[in-house]
From Swiss-Prot:
InterPro entries: C-CAP_CF_C-like, CAP/MinC_C, CARP_motif, TBCC, TBCC_N_sf, Tubulin-bd_cofactor_C_dom. The keyword Protein biosynthesis does not apply. GO terms for cellular component: cytoplasm; microtubule; tubulin folding cofactor complex. Its main location: cytoplasm. PROSITE patterns: C_CAP_COFACTOR_C (PS51329). The lineage of its organism: Eukaryota, Fungi, Dikarya, Ascomycota, Taphrinomycotina. Belongs to the TBCC family. This is Tubulin-specific chaperone C. Signal peptide: none annotated. The keyword Signal does not apply. Residues 112-241 form the C-CAP/cofactor C-like domain. GO terms for molecular function: GTPase activator activity.
Length: 259
């Protein structure tokens, strides 16, 4: 087994539990801390890619299982320190006691959001929207972060990104020609993704068409029916499939986007 991989794992575990942000830490600092730890996992993945032909199949499997374990630990910490916001109505509904009760009242608690703040484009609760570079007040040569959630039937195309985080999207088209860092996707379904990035992470997603260029091994977990158009040298890793035979959860099709 790679000695460097072993040392990286020890160092990662030490940093993971000795420097975990406290409840008083700001949300932005927590997000930065999580992004740094995710990059560290990427370094471990690169190390495994470089030595995979030099180590025994059993050792490679053990290393992959350890990567899966570390990823799950980080996900659990992410859940603990950045829990989802509790559901709240935006405005209270007051009914006088003399009034008759009104049936079938629907209150829209999730207002659409499109705004730019601290070099980050925030998108949330959108349906049938087209979002492009025109919403960014910077010239195209400056990279921005993208954070998006709860999208339905949207087309999102941003030319230059430093990182992208997508959560909970259905029947969308995403295009990110340049991502300097990582793209993290979770709960994405029935969508198309075109992306060039340094690091690709996909979790809990189904039925995707992915046109991908990536400088490190793409990683998927708890996902299925993923079709990749992918020709880079780094193998796609499925952290939920530790067997030696190919994962049934994804396929590589070179002509995926020719139709």
């Amino acid at each position: 087994m790679s000695e460097k991989f072993v040392e990286l794992r020890k160092e990662f575990l030490t940093k993971l539990y000795k420097s975990t942000p406290s409840e008083q830490t700001s949300r932005s600092e927590k997000e930065t801390w999580l992004e740094e730890k995710s990059k560290y996992l990427g370094e471990m993945t690169r190390e495994l890619n470089e030595v995979q032909d030099q180590i025994a199949p059993y050792d490679r499997r053990v290393c992959m299982e350890q990567l899966v374990d570390l990823t799950r630990r980080l996900q659990q910490i992410r859940h603990d320190i950045l829990p989802r916001q509790p559901f709240r109505f935006q405005r209270a509904l007051h009914v006088k006691s003399s009034q008759k009760p009104v049936k079938n009242i629907t209150v829209n608690a999730e207002a659409p959001e499109v705004y730019f703040e601290n070099d980050t484009l925030y998108l949330a609760n959108l349906k049938n929207q087209n979002i492009g570079d025109n919403v960014i007040p910077y010239p195209n040569n400056k990279a921005v972060k993208v954070s998006a959630k709860s999208l339905r039937s949207c087309n999102i195309s941003i030319s230059n990104c430093s990182s992208v985080n997508l959560h909970n999207a259905t029947k969308c088209n995403f295009t990110f020609p340049t991502i300097q860092g990582s793209i993290h996707l979770s709960d994405i379904n029935d969508s198309t993704i075109c992306v060039s990035c340094h690091q690709f992470r996909l979790h809990h997603s189904t039925n995707l068409r992915v046109h991908l260029r990536c400088k490190t091994s793409p990683v998927i977990e708890e996902s299925k029916e993923i079709s990749f158009s992918y020709k880079d040298e780094h193998p796609i890793l499925d952290f939920t499939w530790a067997r030696s035979d190919p994962s049934p959860h994804f396929r590589i099709t070179s002509d995926l986007f020719d139709a």
